């Protein structure tokens, strides 16, 4: 009887061989049938112990595993036994180390490297998304299973960690043992500018960088549910071409050569899928959207798409893929609608991402997660080909697209790269705009207005601390030649909040609600909240739209006049009513949506301030409104400990370069990264 002996190295040997990069896509093999094991042999012997078997339905919360010891067993009987008694009709996956030696009848040896795929993927979800109809849940399970089957098992976190995660998961990728020392260095030491330089000088290959960020992204996803798609294979393929080009020509293809960029789910990338956060809207992308085409031509590498809210239109990124968690406190939201990006970047699973913003959807999640986010004046960057553009809301309020990242110079790199491609030539909506960014000179003292509150909602305690911190630094006499600090009172915050909510949904939300419910998908709490608010307003007719736009334009003139009378160049204030919100409670967007209403550029910047569990409102607090009172109740009902605080810097419309000039002044004073 011929035998097949399987020689399995120790766990340490497996780790070393894996870190040496010996696993490749070409060596991938899935054991799905007894034929793949026996290869025509009469019987097969294993010399193994502690082999882990897994199978069963793909779920987000539970992964079935069975640990057994096997000695001198026959392949077909054991396969049939396990298949029938444990896995039913599921495929069998043997989770083994990488290197196997098979001896056949003629005693020749075949050596194979196997990369096993996960059958299911467990994700931390302390607050589950609502369940839909059985038919919808079956479709959803199919999507989740397809995602899981792309993930090599060596990239899975221990089930014990998923079941009992720390409140702050931001450090797990560094300590979990999945990343090599080099991969940790690549993902933690460099910003996008630094990575581009390291690749151009051949310190790292584009393949090494793509591998590092792909691995860290899937680790981050298991902890925060930040992804909708993960396509490491496409990233490696693209990176190999870039490395070959650099080797042959001795130069890069562009300023983003080899830089991995993560992309919000509704931005089409050829060969992937896009959606608006609900099942009915999922479509296959045959071509790149305009922004993606520009970034690809500049050398960017795409490796994942990120989670967003149902319909995109609220500040919590919970969709059929699950709920995105804040890396610094998983009981808090990562924000929306670009919350997946924010969480991924904060986890250092991305160095640079692209978001959209029509009410705060870049700035709020960036602030929730303590990173940079820039909303340009609306017509500066291209959105041709994005799903949901133009949306019904854009009858009245224009959307912006922009970068999210961890350094000032990365925002500048992004803007320089995209605008250098002259996107206005292919998209008439885009305005020709010469970009000077961080090189814009500031030839006079910067007049900066500080916002303590917007006259409608007082910010929660840690945001007040951050404002005080910034004011104290900016008011230091040693900076008197650089900045003049003033108090600033925003015009019409309550009025703009009332008007913009009406203008977002000129159809009363009927189309979006219908698209969700058509498949049996449940309405998520914040989706329900929005439509309860908007349904009474009903469908707008032409006269309603005309009047709303007239009121908007009148407001914009009044806002500009108020700004001019207060005589400031830029304003610095809260990015949100508080730190990251507790799940399902992101009700008030007033500190971001105001600047969408007037279409002013805004950037959120990180501070060293973190929320503390024991913080309280000041004695003698008097609410400015019912909303203000509710915000205090939200603070007292949750634990925000550890949540980062960003502040928001805003300039006049089309003063985007001046905004970046102001950032160069604030960089040293506030020690901005």
What is the meaning of each model-derived region?
Residues 6-7, 48, 92-244, 472, ...:
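An N-terminal boundary/leader segment
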Residues 203, 220-280:
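N-terminal, positively charged, Ser/Thr/Ala/Gly-biased leader segments
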Residues 255-401, 451-453, 506, 571-588, ...:
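Short glycine/serine-rich loop/turn segments
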């Amino acid at each position: 009887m011929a035998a097949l002996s399987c020689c399995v190295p120790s766990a340490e040997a497996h780790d070393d061989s894996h870190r040496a990069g010996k696993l490749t896509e070409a060596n991938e093999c899935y054991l799905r049938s007894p034929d793949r094991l026996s290869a025509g042999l009469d019987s097969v012997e294993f010399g193994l112990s502690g082999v882990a078997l897994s199978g069963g339905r793909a779920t987000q919360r539970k992964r079935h595993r069975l640990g057994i010891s096997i000695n001198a067993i026959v392949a077909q009987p054991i396969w049939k036994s396990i298949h029938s008694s444990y896995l039913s009709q599921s495929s069998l996956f043997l989770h083994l180390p990488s290197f196997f030696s098979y001896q056949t009848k003629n005693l020749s040896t075949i050596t194979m490297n196997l990369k096993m795929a996960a059958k299911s993927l467990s994700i931390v979800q302390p607050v589950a998304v609502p369940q839909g109809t059985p038919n919808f849940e079956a479709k959803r399970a199919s999507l989740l299973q397809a995602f899981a089957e792309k993930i090599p098992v060596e990239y899975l976190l221990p089930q014990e960690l998923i079941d009992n995660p720390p409140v702050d998961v931001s450090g797990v990728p560094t300590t979990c043992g999945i990343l090599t020392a080099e991969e940790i260095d690549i993902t933690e030491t460099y910003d996008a500018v630094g990575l581009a330089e390291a690749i151009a000088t051949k310190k790292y290959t584009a393949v090494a960088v793509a591998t590092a960020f792909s691995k860290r992204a899937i680790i981050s996803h298991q902890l925060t549910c930040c992804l909708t798609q993960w396509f490491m294979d496409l990233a490696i393929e693209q990176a190999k071409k870039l490395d070959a080009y650099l080797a042959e020509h001795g130069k890069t293809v562009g300023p983003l050569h080899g830089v991995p960029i993560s992309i919000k789910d509704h931005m089409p990338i050829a060969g992937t899928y896009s959606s608006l956060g609900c099942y009915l809207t999922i479509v296959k992308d045959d071509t790149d959207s305009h922004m993606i085409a520009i970034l690809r031509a500049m050398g960017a590498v795409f490796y994942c798409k990120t989670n967003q809210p149902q319909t995109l239109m609220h500040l919590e990124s919970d969709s059929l893929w699950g709920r995105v968690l804040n890396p610094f406190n998983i009981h808090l939201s990562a924000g929306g609608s670009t919350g997946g990006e924010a969480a991924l970047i904060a986890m250092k699973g991305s160095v640079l991402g692209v978001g959209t913003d029509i009410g705060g959807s870049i700035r709020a999640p960036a602030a929730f997660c303590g990173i940079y986010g820039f909303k340009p004046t609306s017509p500066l960057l291209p959105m041709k080909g994005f799903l949901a553009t133009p949306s019904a809301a854009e009858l009245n309020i224009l959307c912006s697209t922009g970068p999210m990242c961890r350094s000032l110079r990365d925002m500048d790199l992004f803007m320089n790269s995209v605008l250098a491609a002259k996107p206005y030539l292919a998209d008439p909506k885009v305005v020709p705009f010469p970009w000077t960014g961080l090189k814009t000179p500031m030839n006079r003292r910067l007049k900066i207005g500080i916002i303590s509150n917007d006259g409608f909602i007082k910010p929660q305690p840690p945001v007040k601390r951050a404002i005080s911190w910034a004011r104290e630094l900016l008011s230091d006499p040693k900076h008197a030649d650089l900045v003049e600090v003033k108090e600033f009172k925003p015009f019409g915050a309550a009025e703009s909040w009332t008007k913009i909510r009406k203008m977002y949904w000129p159809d009363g939300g009927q189309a979006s609600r219908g698209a969700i419910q058509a498949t049996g998908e449940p309405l998520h709490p914040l989706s329900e909240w929005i439509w309860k608010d908007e349904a009474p307003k009903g469908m707008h007719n032409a006269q309603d739209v005309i009047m709303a736009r007239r009121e908007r334009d009148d407001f914009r003139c009044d806002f500009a006049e108020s700004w001019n009378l207060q005589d400031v160049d830029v304003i610095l204030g809260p990015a949100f009513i508080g730190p990251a919100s507790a799940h399902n409670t992101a009700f008030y967007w007033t500190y971001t949506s105001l600047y969408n209403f007037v279409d002013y550029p805004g950037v959120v910047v990180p501070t060293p301030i973190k929320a503390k569990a024991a913080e309280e409102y000041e004695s003698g607090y008097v609410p400015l409104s019912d909303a203000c009172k509710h915000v205090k109740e939200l603070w007292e009902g949750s634990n925000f400990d550890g949540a980062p605080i960003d502040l928001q810097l805003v300039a006049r419309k089309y003063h985007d370069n001046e905004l970046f000039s102001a950032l160069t002044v604030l960089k040293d004073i506030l020690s901005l990264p």
